Amino acid sequence: MSITTAQEQQFYDSAYAVHLHVSDDALRTNRESMLRDLNQPSGAFYERRKLYSAVLAELLSQPLTGQVVLDYGCGVGEWGVLMATEGAQATLLDLSPVAIEVGLRRAAANGVAHLVRGCARDASDLSCFSDGEFDLVYASAALHHTLKYPNALAELLRVLRPGGRLVLAETYGNNPVLNGLRRLRWRLSRQPDDAGEDIILGDRELDMLRNHFSRLDVTPMNLFAMAKRVFRARFESGAVRTTMGVLDAMDRRLLQLAPSLGRYCGEVLVVAEK
């Protein structure tokens, strides 16, 4: 099922609209709340806790005070506002105007409205930003949506300053079994957002990025542990968490013995320096 920019925007506007009506308390976002959500089985981030824990460590590995950062494909703005609470000047970018509205409200709820601005547009035209405007660009599960847009990668590279840092938290697309299951799920779901995810970040895309960065580090994770998708919304079960612990241990051991199998993992953290 093909998808247009308008269809994708409409889908996400609808998906994010529920956040327009939550309380300010529900929008509290800082380092402590993020750590709590990552370790709370009922939390939205728990399924990807390994990936997002690595993201959090990377984002906080250097002082953010005074840094100019872009939350690229920000969704409802958790990461951009988090960086603002650490002292960054944050810009939220998303195709969905509703997402930007929620993100700016989140910024106000956390007392950092003066450090956060929003821009609603598709990634093929970032003319709202100047060349080399950002010290850091972070994209959480966003690049596989935007690469289908003409000029999206060139625009991302343009707005990141020389020496700037790109951090990507992404689905990893080298495993034919996982890719087949993903595509089956997309066809069954009949949802335009899933149909729009037709470029999954894999070795080809990473090689393309390497041509533009002086350094690019890739940390794959979750091979057997991608079975977590089967247990979605059931992580409060002790038996499920025990099973996931066993799968995580299997992954650690196998990837120690055969690091080359990392390319078949289901998720990846990419850190690059321009």
Where are the predicted features?
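A short glycine-rich, Lys/Arg-flanked "PGG" loop and its adjoining helix->strand segment in the class I
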Residues: P150-P162
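A short acidic, Gly/Pro-enriched loop at the edge of an enzyme's catalytic core
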Residues: S124-L136
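A C-terminal cap/extension of S-adenosyl-L-methionine-dependent methyltransferases
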Residues: R185-W186, P220-K274
